[in-house]
Amino acid sequence: MQISAYLCALIACCGLTLSAPTANNKSSSEAPPLLLVSFDGFRADYLNKYSFPNLEKFFSDGVLVHELTNVFTTKTFPNHYSLVTGLYAESHGMLASIMYDPVAKKHFSIKNDSDPFWWDEATPIWVSVEESGYHAASAMWPGSDVNIQNHTLKYTFKYDSRVSFKERLGNITQWMTTDKSLKFASLYWEEPDFSGHTYGPDNTTEMARVLKEVDGHVGYLMEELDRMELWGKINVIITSDHGMAQCSEERIIRLDDCVSPSSYTLVDLTPVAAIIPLEDKTTVYNNLSSCHVHLKAYMKNDVPDRLHYKNNERIQPIILVADEGWTIVKNGRLPRLGDHGYDNTLPSMHPFLAAHGPAFRKGYKMSSFNSVDLYPLMCHLIGIPPKANNGSFAHVRCTLVNEQCGELALAVGLVMGVLIILTTFTCLFKLMKNRNVSSPRPFARLELDDDGDDEPLLE
């Protein structure tokens, strides 16, 4: 009886734990605003190699995710769109910095990016926010100034690299404080990507200089939010789209040395080249396959599934992927000392993530999660339903102060295991006890009573 009582108490406790609500059930009207900031090309391991006093202050009172596994190709436009849609590039259609759509016969480049045609295959979070009856804002996030699915942001302005970080942030904080229905804002900054391309990530002198500037922007961000009485009241996420790899003149792959220039059209260049064969596709593919030991060639349908880069009409018939640090050119020289776009399993391609605000744990660190997981997290923070996506809220819920996560699940599992063992032993104990006190005549229970009872087994 005593063991049974203990079991009942344990089961009751576990029942309460398991049935307790795990979601942040705040409606979007109650949820604080969310600010998403991207520092383009911020490689994850910069955090280990350089000093970031302001950024460290930011995540010491919040969350740090050491690495994000981003999407392939590890380029700016595909990854910024994945962050706000939760989709792989093949799903949202923003596949590269230069694209060609063979059905519409249209060309895309970063200098010609305002046609909604290229963006309408997905729904970015700012569209969902406005569909929910709230407002969103953006300071130069890729695609934020485009009319997507017949939605144009109320608060935005076109990309202009001459606009300072302070001015971009100033617009965001002004909009947030004057419009209480503004629930989401995004801000984009070009560095350290620009310097990484120009000098290469191995140039520690130049990278130390630009990363000090970036850390200064983080410091200003905290000061400005505090001045506007937003610090600690809104949720802030700082992240990036990709990392950066060092390139050199000694690591160049010249395609014209392998195939006739007249046999192919090059849509996107390096380090992932998109090829349209103008002659026999198999011949062109075979020549490219044997072109260089540091170059992998794939027919579109043979691109590895893990890259999620085959199921879209904008992906060209032949895809070339250079090894880390190698550069693909037609016949020219090295275009830049640093580059990205390589295989998304490479640590050099990974960005980081830091978060701060009332929804986030304090001093919490994670090793990694997928960049597409950020989208369902942001929808949860704002309190809006996510669109279909490739991410998982379960992967990121441990970052939140009100969420149960892996440690608790393990503890509950251990308790349940102990309960099963105790229950088994209790049942065996009772069976043995009943057997010891039972009648010596094994068939006595089957004897009928004198009153004609015909249900002897239903005692």
From Swiss-Prot:
Active site: T76
Subcellular location: Cell membrane
GO annotations of cellular component type: plasma membrane
Highest taxon, organism lineage: Eukaryota
A single GO BP: blood coagulation
Membrane side Cytoplasmic: residue ranges: 430-459
Gene3D superfamilies assigned: 3.30.1360.180, Alkaline Phosphatase, subunit A
Entry note: cofactor: Binds 2 Zn(2+) ions per subunit.
Cystine connections: C258-C291, C398-C405
Transmembrane segments: 409-429
Listed CDD domains: Enpp
Residues the record lists as binding substrate: Y159, D193
Record has Cytoplasm as a keyword: no
Keywords associated with the record: Blood coagulation, Cell membrane, Disulfide bond, Glycoprotein, Hemostasis, Hydrolase, Membrane, Metal-binding, Signal, Transmembrane, Transmembrane helix, Zinc
Pfam family, one: Phosphodiest
Catalytic activity: P(1),P(3)-bis(5'-adenosyl) triphosphate + H2O = AMP + ADP + 2 H(+)
Binding locations of Zn(2+) 2: D193, H197, H340
UniProt record similarity statement: Belongs to the nucleotide pyrophosphatase/phosphodiesterase family.
Function: Hydrolyzes extracellular Ap3A into AMP and ADP, and Ap4A into AMP and ATP. Ap3A and Ap4A are diadenosine polyphosphates thought to induce proliferation of vascular smooth muscle cells. Acts as a procoagulant, mediating platelet aggregation at the site of nascent thrombus via release of ADP from Ap3A and activation of ADP receptors.
Protein name as annotated: Bis(5'-adenosyl)-triphosphatase enpp4
Organism: Danio rerio (Zebrafish)
